[in-house]
Amino acid sequence: MEDCLTFPSRMKAAVLAFFVLLPLLHAAPPNVVVILADDLGYGDLGCYGHPVFKTPRIDQMAAEGVKMMQFNTPAPFCAPTRAALLTGRYPFRCGMTQNPAPDGGPEADALSLPKSEVTLAQVLKSAGYATGMVGKWHLGDQTGALPTDRGFDEYYGIPYSNDMRPVQ
């Protein structure tokens, strides 16, 4: 079968594609904001259809950006949920099947996201993003396990919940 595009028409298409795609090469990368809140249900924000709660700023960010419509985790605890969100893996595949201390005893005290797991923050940082986290980390409190060791440039928060054991 004979090719229906001649050389001049191919050149025109290539030049057109070049000028259409060129601005994309210089476009600023998008900002990435992830909001993860304990005990916030799927329909508890205006942008997800709640008829009473008013969340205008979050609704605006959702309208101008991307909403997660199918994220869920098979563990009903906060640490495994965070691990799944940050690694893109099931909690049991990255070793985070329960919450670390204070209520889990010595085994849970030592629990942290394995260093071999790559986090979303590490990927974004390697792409030139400045990264930060505010709030409860809950993925380990030992050296090498804190947010600033796992790809976040800045961190303001606590390693566990507000019922942590006193430091001895």
What are these regions (language model features)?
Residues M1-D3, P23, A28:
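Intrinsic disorder/low-complexity signature
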Residues M1-M11:
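N-terminal secretory signal peptides that target proteins for export/translocation
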Residues A13-P23:
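Bacterial N-terminal signal peptides
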Residues L25-Q168:
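Formylglycine-dependent sulfatase
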